[in-house]
Amino acid sequence: MAFASITFIAASRRRAVLLLPLLLASLPAAAHSELRRSVPAAGAVLMQAPEQMELHFNERVQLTALRLYRDGSEEISLPRRAIRSATTEIIALPPLPPGAYRAEWRIISADGHPAGGVIPFRIEAPKRP
């Protein structure tokens, strides 16, 4: 009986060793491009309008779209990118009045996967004394 148990355990281990590479190969890659930080930051409340928007990624990306909306629906026209590096995009912004904003971005990562996100922020009207 002990011999049968040992044989069964050995056979199970062999199957596990043979199946493990197949299981690992079928898992999706976990390390995709991600936005590390932005200026303005998501959820920021600003007392003055930013002059530029910065997107900092964890790896080389290609920015395919950046759209800025004010108060939910009004799209703000953005100029071409001001500065670009492998992992950073800096975009000059036009003068922005107070209000709620939403920046929507899309990228293609170095491994070809698309990704995107939303950065909401708010510009407050200056306080009057």
Task: Name what the model sees in each region.
Residues 15-22:
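N-terminal export leaders
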Residues 26-28:
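N-terminal signal peptide c-region/cleavage motif recognized by signal peptidases
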Residues 31-49:
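N-terminal edge beta-strand
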Residues 32-35, 114-129:
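Extracytoplasmic/periplasmic copper-protein system
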Residues 58-63:
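Short proline/glycine-enriched turn/loop motifs at strand-loop junctions of beta-rich domains
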Residues 87-91:
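Short strand-edge motifs at loop-to-beta-strand transitions and within beta-strands
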Residues 92, 97-103:
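A glycine-anchored, Pro-Gly-centered beta-turn/N-cap motif
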